[in-house]
């Protein structure tokens, strides 16, 4: 399971140094590669190949014929998926096609989230964290009480 947030920079050639902690998890539990895809203009998702295969199967099984929003989301993820492998220095090349679709450039945060990694622009990540910390705790407690989540 991935966890933690790492402030990083994408170099001038589009390479991102993947922290050793994440590379070790990938090498130990999966293969030394990830599938990267767009989720929104704010972040890229990076899945171990085995996890991506599960997600892709679920996406392909979505009933999207009568739902253009879901169809576009399905297409966004599937059409932009690319396998990334790291070099001997532990870097992955973030493809130019993905980089041009997101609204961040060099300063990024690579976040571990259970079965995947998320690549956020640093400003977007900070804004998301500020919002999460500013959420009304009583409203959050109520919303959580409506779920099965046990913390």
From Swiss-Prot:
**Principal subcellular localisation of the protein:** cytoplasm
The record's GO molecular-function terms, alphabetically, read: DNA-binding transcription factor activity; transcription cis-regulatory region binding
**Name of the protein this chain belongs to:** Transcriptional regulator MraZ
High-level lineage? Bacteria, Pseudomonadati, Pseudomonadota, Betaproteobacteria, Neisseriales
Q: Where is the signal peptide?
A: none
Ubl conjugation as a keyword? no
Keyword hit for Oxidoreductase = no
One Pfam match, given by its short name, reads MraZ
Q: Where in the cell is it found?
A: Cytoplasm, Nucleoid
Q: Please give the GO cellular component terms listed in this UniProt entry.
A: cytoplasm; nucleoid
| Organism from which the protein derives | Neisseria gonorrhoeae (strain ATCC 700825 / FA 1090)
Tell me the protein family, please: Belongs to the MraZ family.
